[in-house]
C-alpha cells in the first residue's frame, strides 16, 4: 500500500495511468494475534460456518486480516483524494474467491463464488450504492473499456456493467457460469446460477467425498474434521433454490416438482460448455507428469508423504 500510495503521490499528470495493486491479506495464514478492536467472543462466523469457540477465534483472525486490507485500500484512496484525482479515476476493488474456509473457497456455493466487487466511476449514479444484479469477472474488461472509451476486443465474452453503474436497478445478465478444476487436487465442477436457482455438476464420480486438500488448514477445518468431515457426501448433481435455501443445503435435483427447472438449467449449462469448448466434455484435464497434484483422498495440501501425490487424472464423466 505504501508503494502504491508513493507512486500516486509522485504522479505528474502528464498522461493517463493504470495501477494494479494486490495484497496478501486476506489469504491464510491469518494473523495469530487478534486486533484489539476485535473480540473473538462476540464475532459471528458467516454461513456455512457453525458458531463455536474454535470458529469464532478463526474468524476473528480473518477479521484482523480484513482490517489490514481495509486500511491498505484506504491508504491508496486517501492519496488519490489528496492529489485531487478521485473524480478523474475509475476505482475497482475485487477478490478472486470466497473465504478460505470449508464449503467456501474452491466450491461453487455462493460462499465460494460470491466475491466483493466495488466500482467507483466518475459521475455514475450507482456510486455508493449496492447493486443486486448478477455480474461475472468476465464483465470487468468490457466495463473498463466502456468507462474509458476504449474499443472492446472482439474476443471478449463478458458484458459491460456500465448500465448498472448508470442505474442501480438495471440488469445485464440472466445467468452466470462458474467452474473449479484444481486447487491442490483435481475436483472438476461446473455450475450455472440465475437469480433464483443454482445447478451444480460434479464430474469426478470416482470420489464423491470432500477433497480435503482443497481446504486450507485452519481451526475451522479441524472443527469440521472432529465431527466427521471425511464422511460427508457430495452429490453428482445439485439444484438449489437460492430464495428459500440461502445456505444451499437442500438438494432439489431429482425431485419431480423441480424437474422442469433442473432440465432447463442443465441444458443451458451444456450449451455453455459446448460454446466454450470446455475440455470437461472430452474427459477432463489431464495432469502433466511435471505437475504436483494431491490425491483426492489426501487430507492436507502440504503433506510430506510422496504417496499423497499423483500425476494422472482418473475417472472423469463425459458429457455431450
Language model: regions and residue ranges:
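Histidine-centered active-site microenvironments of extracellular/periplasmic hydrolases
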Residues: 29, 79-136, 302-308
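Long, internal low-complexity/basic segments
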Residues: 114, 228-236, 242-244, 252-320
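Core domains of carbohydrate- and sulfate-ester-processing enzymes
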Residues: 15-54, 197-227, 292-316
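A long, amphipathic alpha-helix that forms part
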Residues: 2-8, 44-89, 124, 147
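C-terminal cap/loop subdomain of S1 sulfatases and analogous C-terminal strand-loop tails that border
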Residues: 99-101, 148-238, 293, 308, ...
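Active-site regions of oxyanion-processing enzymes, predominantly non-cytosolic
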Residues: 1-46, 81-90, 102, 175, ...
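Polar, surface-exposed loop/tail segments
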Residues: 1, 87-88, 128-194, 250, ...
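A short beta-strand-to-alpha-helix junction
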Residues: 58-72, 107-115, 125-142, 148-160, ...
Amino acid at each position: 500500500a505504501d508503494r502504491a500510495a508513493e507512486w500516486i503521490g509522485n504522479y505528474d499528470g502528464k498522461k493517463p495511468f493504470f495501477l494494479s495493486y494486490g495484497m496478501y491479506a486476506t489469504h491464510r495464514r491469518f494473523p495469530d494475534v487478534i486486533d484489539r478492536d476485535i473480540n473473538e467472543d462476540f464475532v459471528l462466523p458467516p454461513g456455512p460456518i457453525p458458531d463455536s469457540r474454535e470458529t469464532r477465534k478463526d474468524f476473528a483472525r480473518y477479521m484482523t486480516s480484513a482490517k489490514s486490507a481495509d486500511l491498505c485500500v484506504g491508504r491508496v484512496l486517501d492519496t488519490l483524494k489528496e492529489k485531487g484525482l478521485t473524480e478523474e479515476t475509475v476505482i475497482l476493488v475485487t477478490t478472486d474467491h470466497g473465504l478460505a474456509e470449508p464449503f467456501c473457497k474452491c466450491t461453487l456455493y455462493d460462499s465460494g463464488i460470491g466475491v466483493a466487487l466495488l466500482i467507483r466511476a466518475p459521475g455514475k449514479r450507482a456510486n455508493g450504492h449496492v447493486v443486486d444484479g448478477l455480474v461475472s469477472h468476465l464483465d470487468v474488461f468490457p466495463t473498463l473499456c466502456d468507462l474509458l472509451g476504449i474499443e472492446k476486443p472482439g474476443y471478449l465474452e463478458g458484458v459491460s456493467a456500465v448500465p448498472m453503474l448508470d442505474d442501480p436497478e438495471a440488469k445485464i445478465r440472466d445467468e452466470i457460469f462458474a467452474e473449479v478444476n484444481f486447487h491442490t487436487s483435481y475436483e472438476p465442477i461446473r455450475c450455472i446460477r440465475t437469480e433464483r436457482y443454482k445447478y451444480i455438476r460434479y464430474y469426478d464420480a470416482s470420489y464423491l467425498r470432500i477433497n480435503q486438500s482443497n481446504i486450507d488448514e485452519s481451526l475451522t477445518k479441524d472443527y469440521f474434521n472432529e465431527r466427521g468431515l471425511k464422511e460427508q457426501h457430495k452429490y453428482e448433481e445439485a439444484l438449489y433454490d437460492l430464495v428459500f435455501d440461502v445456505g444451499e443445503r437442500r438438494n432439489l435435483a431429482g425431485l419431480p416438482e423441480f424437474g422442469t427447472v433442473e432440465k432447463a438449467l442443465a441444458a443451458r449449462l451444456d450449451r455453455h460448455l459446448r460454446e466454450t469448448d470446455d475440455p470437461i466434455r472430452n474427459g477432463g484435464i489431464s495432469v502433466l507428469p511435471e505437475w504436483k497434484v494431491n490425491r483426492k483422498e489426501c487430507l492436507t495440501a502440504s503433506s510430506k508423504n510422496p504417496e499423497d501425490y499423483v500425476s494422472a487424472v482418473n475417472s472423469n464423466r463425459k458429457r455431450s
